[in-house]
Amino acid sequence: MRRVLRRAAASAVALFVFSSAAWAADVEAGRNKAQVCAACHGPEGNSANPAMPSLAGQPAQAIATQLFQFREGNRKNPQMSPMAANLSNADMNDLAAYFSSVQPTPPKRRAAPQNAAAGQDLTKKFHCVQCHGPALRGQQHIPSLAGQQADYLRAQLEGFKASSRADMDGNMTSVAQELTDKDIDVLVDYIAGLGAQ
Amino acid sequence: MRPLIAVVVLSAFATVQAQDKPAAEPPPPWQQGKPAAMSESTLHPFFPHLAGRSVKELPVEKLKVPAGFKVEVWAEGIPEARSLALGDKGTVFVSNRLSKNVYAVVDKGGQREVKTVLKGLNAPNGIVFKNGSLYVAERDRITRYDGIEDRLDNPPEPKVVVDNLDPQKQPGHFWKYLAIGPDGKLYFNIGAPGNIVMPNYMQASIMRVDPATGVLETVALGVRNSVGFDWHPKTKELWFTNHGRDWLGDESPNDTLHRVSKGVPNFGYPFCHQGDTPDPEYGKSRSCKEFTPPALKLGAHIAPLGMRFYNGKMFPAEYRNNIFVAMHGSWNRTTKQGYSLMRVKVDEKGHAKMEPFLTGFLTDEKADPPMWGRPVDVLVMKDGSLLFSDDYNGILYRISYAK
């Protein structure tokens, strides 16, 4: 009984922390500010374009961190850099709160049968799960990968391998050096297919 | 003779075989050295809110200081505020690890204005100000910006003091702390390239460079990663904080406070931790007796960062020449501790004692995250008040004292 009570208390604390975090940045303000994002990232941040990343359901810190890096010129992209240039800190936190609150509706895509097990093995071999989490759903500033758009995933992995994709701490650039073209094919197919499960 | 050759050939063959076997990919540096028994551990570092968080949404009223002291927010909106440096004209320069900028906070009649003064730098964690110049330690070099306080909106081009400090683009602890010693030399750390790995001859050290000549010298070895140092105002000895290794459990090893009293001491990494605990792997054939012990054990994984001797006049006399240490707080511990400022009293023989000075960031030692803010560096202001930075929220706080 005591243990049950303690667990209940712990989940009450977790709820409180979650709701205070949601209150911190403004989801509704974020929804208004996000209208312009839909043109590329899809309705409510659920992208239907294989080259454009979905933002729905990403960890809030992952969204805010990338917006910050675009604004500061540390990550560059012809479409995103001008979009982020005039965002305030509050704008970035509101957008992050909004997109993280949206339910993701990933494409109904499944990995080719031969890639499902091989892809899972690669995510362990290359330690993807160590930072992106066991289900590749991200944490803090680390983005969720599961069900992300395939061409976008490929472009990021190839960019890290070419050392041309912005990388704050070098972890992704470092690990991507060891990826073969085949590894990238398998990883992209596997990860992009995880949303359908 | 023949059998010997056979043995040599065989062992060479075995070496080739071992290298041909595909090696496991190296884990990210923060996971390196994690034993199999901890493979299911979900402990992870905490990442700052780069876009900052507004004071209005934070429980700043929870911060506690001793009677007579007062803590207040001094400036906000400074992304990932880390190291602090004070300009001759009162400008507070603020660094970071990941945002590539250096910020300046200018006090305008009680209102603080935050300016981005330097952009596009490579992990500019270390900053120090001396004789009108701001020195910046990036990942790979140390530069100098002359007369910058008069040109915050149009900063001068940097002059390179020393370059090529990171020829291998090392993983792990690649950011640097920077301070100027009583000898006028620039002191900086080169961290270990992972959690528990054999460093090369320049890594896991504190070094110094003479800004006039560019000559480099080693100051201390066996230092896993120091992100704070200062000199005792009377003895002029160097004191510094150091982070112990991860993944040895909740209580081991301690992070440490060190004193350099003579020569070029070796403090033990990666062979010996906290002066008395051999590393399970690297310590097998070495003894802790070979190494210089720390002046004080600070707590396991408590993450001591910036530290300064208090040489101001505002605080009561017993605070003079005490050290304030910013505890960034533990992540590699199931029950969290730290997220505080500690006061360390030292005597002239080097004996040290520690007590809490500012608490209140830690709200639930079992939660994820367990805290709402994280102290990084401390700075004694001209009026004797104490500033400290919080990189988690991008905020500077001021602690003052009135009878």
Predicted regions and their residues:
Chain B
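Beta-propeller domain segments
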Residues: 21-66, 175, 192-195, 201, ...
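Surface loop/turn motifs at the tips and blade-to-blade linkers of beta-strand repeat domains
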Residues: 73-78, 115-120, 161-170, 218-222, ...
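Beta-rich catalytic cores
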Residues: 80, 98, 113, 120-123, ...
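Short loop/turn segments immediately following the C-termini of beta-strands
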Residues: 96-97, 139-141, 147, 191-193, ...
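A short loop-to-beta-strand structural motif that recurs across blades of beta-propeller domains
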Residues: 101-104, 141-143, 205-207, 256, ...
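Asp-box/WD-like beta-propeller blade repeats and closely related beta-sheet repeat scaffolds
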Residues: 114, 123, 128, 140-181, ...
